[in-house]
C-alpha cells in the first residue's frame, strides 16, 4: 500500500507545437480551478462541500476541482501528497477549509465573508468578467499497464506569457474508517502545481500540444482517476491566474468546449 509521500509521483513531460488555428475565434467555456486544502475528518470542510453540492448543476460544472488532503485529524488523513503539503506551506494555509480559486485568492473558513453557496457561485462571474477565457484545452489519455499518459492540446487565442500544470486526481475513494467517499483527491503532480512556463512565449494565436504521464499507485483505481490540466496566463498586474483548463479521465478524451 502506498501512503504518505510515496503517493505523489512526478513524471516526465514533452512539448510540441502545431500550427492549426481551427476555431481560434470561438469563445471558450470558462472553467474555474478550485483547489481545496482539506483533511478527512474536518467538519467545516464537510459543511463547505455541502455548499458546493447545493449549487445548480450548471454552476458546479464550471469548476475543475483538486482536493489537496493534508496529514491532519484523528484518524490521520491517509490521502495526503507531498506536493500538496508543499503547496499548503508555500501558500501559508493554516485553517481548514481553505479554498483557492484560479490561484488568485485564498478563501478561508465557512459562512458570511468566507466559503458559502453565494461566494462560490460568484467566482464564476468574477472569472468570466475579470479574466475571460483566451485559451481552451482538449486532451486524450491512454493507459499502458500502470502508466497513465495524456496528450493535452491548448488553443491559445492571444499572445502572452503562459504556464501549464497537470495533476492526477482520484474519485470515489471509500474510506472504511469514516464510511465516507472522497472525490478529486490529488494523487500525483506532473508539473509544478503553480505551473511550468510555456516556452517559447506565445506570440500569436496557435495550438500547442503537451504530453504528460503518471504512474498509477498500487492501491489506486485507474478507472476512477483523471488528469486535470490547467493553464495560467500572466495578467497586467504581473500575476499568473488560471485562465482555463480541462479534466480528462484516464484512458478517455475531452474536446474543446465552447460557450453556446
Predicted regions and their residues:
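Short, small-residue-biased leader/transition segments that mark boundaries at the very start
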Residues: 2-9
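Residue-level preference for short coil/turn positions at secondary-structure junctions
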Residues: 3, 28-30, 95, 223
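C-terminal edge beta-strand
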Residues: 11-19
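Intrinsic low-complexity, intrinsically disordered segments enriched in polar/basic residues
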Residues: 20-26, 247-249
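Local sequence-structure signature of Cys/Sec-based thiol-disulfide redox active-site neighborhoods
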Residues: 23-69
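Short, conserved sequence motifs used for protein processing/export or organelle targeting and
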Residues: 66-260
